[in-house]
A protein has these predicted regions:
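Polybasic phosphoinositide-binding surfaces of eukaryotic membrane-targeting domains
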Residues: 55-60, 65-67
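Short aromatic-glycine motifs in intrinsically disordered, low-complexity regions
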Residues: 64-80
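Acidic, Ser/Thr- and proline-rich intrinsically disordered linker/docking segments
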Residues: 1-56, 78, 84-141
């Protein structure tokens, strides 16, 4: 197994490939503490202030996600789903989010190809553990 770590900023990025899981886990733990918590806090503060964030074709707001239903004929349809209407899961190298009652309304995000998907996943998992109606309630204010 090869473990890949990709990190960077708006202009540069670096990629590291590791063979040992212990080294990979240690690196990821330190990277999360150094950067992940700050990114998570910035997203939550932005959401609280009314900002929206795009991940692929999906748009995240404080109250839920706007997902895109792809149509074979005609233009695609955008559907807003509140956090309580959504479900998440993982596939091979991807994070997925979709509407509970509609298997055709879902978005898939590549961990390697899209920025900050781990932060998005962490925020949603923490939110569902804690509960609430707004993602920014994780700030505890």
């Amino acid at each position: 197994t090869t473990y890949s770590i990709i990190f960077g900023n708006g202009s540069n990025y670096a990629s590291i490939e590791l063979k040992k899981e212990a080294i990979y886990s240690n690196f990821i733990d330190r990277l999360w503490r150094a950067v992940g918590v700050r990114l998570l806090t910035e997203y939550l503060e932005g959401l609280r202030d009314g900002k929206k964030y795009r991940f692929g074709s999906a748009v995240m707001s404080d109250h839920g996600m706007e997902l895109e239903r792809k149509k074979l004929f005609g233009s695609n349809e955008r559907v807003f789903c509140r956090w309580g209407e959504l479900v998440i899961w993982n596939g091979a190298g991807v994070f997925c989010i979709g509407k509970k009652e509609d298997k055709k309304l879902a978005a898939t995000f590549s961990y390697q190809e899209e920025d900050n998907i781990h932060v998005l996943e962490a925020a949603i998992r923490m939110f569902w553990k804690r509960g609430g109606d707004r993602l920014s309630c994780l700030l505890g204010e």
